[in-house]
A protein has these predicted regions:
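Active-site environment of divalent metal-dependent phosphoester hydrolases
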Residues: 15-17, 37-38, 66-72, 102-104
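Flexible, acidic/histidine-containing loops and adjacent segments that form or flank the divalent-metal
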Residues: 1-6, 81-213
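Structural recognition of the beta-strand scaffold that forms the well-ordered cores
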Residues: 22, 29-32, 59-63, 94-98, ...
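Conserved beta-strand hairpin/beta-sheet module of binuclear metal-dependent hydrolase folds
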Residues: 2-57
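A short acidic (Asp/Glu
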Residues: 20-21, 70-76, 106-109
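Active-site metal-binding motif and surrounding structural segment of the metallo-beta-lactamase
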Residues: 42-95
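Active-site-proximal beta-strand/loop segments in catalytic clefts of secreted hydrolases
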Residues: 34-35, 64-66, 100, 186
Length: 213
């Protein structure tokens, strides 16, 4: 499908999303979410290999949710793609993804994250914790976000590099050449609420005395 010169392709992702946008005039390509892992294996991998064979790259990947039907396909891609400097599938310039650690950082930006919270975050690296997202009314797993963050770091990908404070948030306008992207969501309020809820669950499952205000 093409709208105003922009190519839009929605790959099969069942209940999730996997959306490809190409802006020919700006020579810019963006992937929004990756659906399930099977979305990657059945559809996305072949699609990206074709792009790479044409000499194209992904300028930006945007991960909007940490639910399986949005994030798992991206995890599968990064796991197979490997090192960003020598990718096995396709070159990726940058990834936008707010990890839970960044949500906590947004809440503590002014007061600073306490040493106790930092220690607990490190200690929880191998633990699965589910909590109810106030806005989505469904359980989402910290493990999804943690694993993606690890893959981004291990592959040396540019992570939220073009946004202020490395946090994708409402109101920012990001320029890629002559292409301008205005970020509509999430707002800082949403991010800080998620961070506060995460800290609450850390407090419930740890013996450490953490005061949450």
């Amino acid at each position: 499908m093409e709208i105003n010169g922009v190519t839009i392709q929605m790959l099969p992702a069942a209940s999730g999303d996997c959306i490809y946008l190409e802006f020919p005039d700006s020579d810019f390509r963006m992937l929004i979410d990756g659906g399930y892992a099977k979305t990657y294996q059945k559809y996305l991998k072949k699609f990206l290999l074709k792009l790479a064979a044409e000499g194209k790259r992904l300028n930006l990947i945007v991960v909007t949710h940490i639910d399986d039907d949005h994030i798992s396909g991206i995890r599968a891609l990064l796991k197979e793609n490997g090192d960003s400097r020598n990718p096995k599938i396709i070159e990726i310039d940058e990834i936008w993804f707010n990890s839970l650690n960044q949500c906590i950082t947004s809440r503590n930006a002014e007061q600073g994250m306490s040493f106790a919270v930092k220690i607990i975050l490190k200690s929880m690296c191998s633990t699965d914790i589910d909590f109810e997202c106030e806005y989505k009314k469904q359980n989402i797993s910290y493990t999804n976000g943690k694993n993606l963050a690890e893959l981004i770091q291990a592959g040396g990908y540019r992570w939220n590099a073009s946004v202020v404070d490395n946090l994708v948030s409402k109101g920012q306008i990001v320029q890629f050449g002559d292409l301008k992207i205005t970020i509509l969501n999430p707002g800082i309020e949403t991010l800080t609420k998620m961070g506060k809820k995460w800290l609450y669950h850390l407090k419930q499952i740890n013996s450490n005395n953490i005061e949450i205000t």
